[in-house]
């Protein structure tokens, strides 16, 4: 099918330790991810886009069970990772470029 497609993704912008301690960012991030995974259970068509790879590393270290749930959702194509491009680079899709999350491939 060559028809154009569009998708809506859930997204939560989580500043990394902006005006609060890093430990609070880790906790808030875990709660946000857990909520997104719960939404995926409720709504099979729901997709989520995460925009900070350091948050993934924190989940792997601090919340391993949650990290495994994230990996499962990535493998299902329901949880996407994004990274911000360098502000000096021209990105065709704007300031965010979708990247492949390595953990889904392991």
Residue locations for each model-derived region?
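Carbohydrate-active enzymes and regulators
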Residues: 1-106
């Amino acid at each position: 099918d060559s028809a154009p497609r569009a998708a809506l993704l859930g997204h939560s912008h989580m500043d990394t330790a902006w005006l609060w301690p890093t430990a609070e960012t880790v906790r808030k991030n875990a709660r946000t991810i857990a909520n997104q995974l719960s939404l995926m259970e409720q709504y099979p068509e729901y997709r989520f886009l995460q925009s900070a790879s350091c948050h993934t590393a924190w989940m792997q270290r601090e919340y391993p069970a949650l990290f495994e749930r994230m990996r499962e959702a990535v493998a299902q194509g329901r949880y996407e990772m994004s990274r911000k491009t360098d502000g000096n680079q021209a990105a065709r899709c704007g300031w965010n470029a979708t990247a492949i999350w390595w953990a889904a491939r392991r």
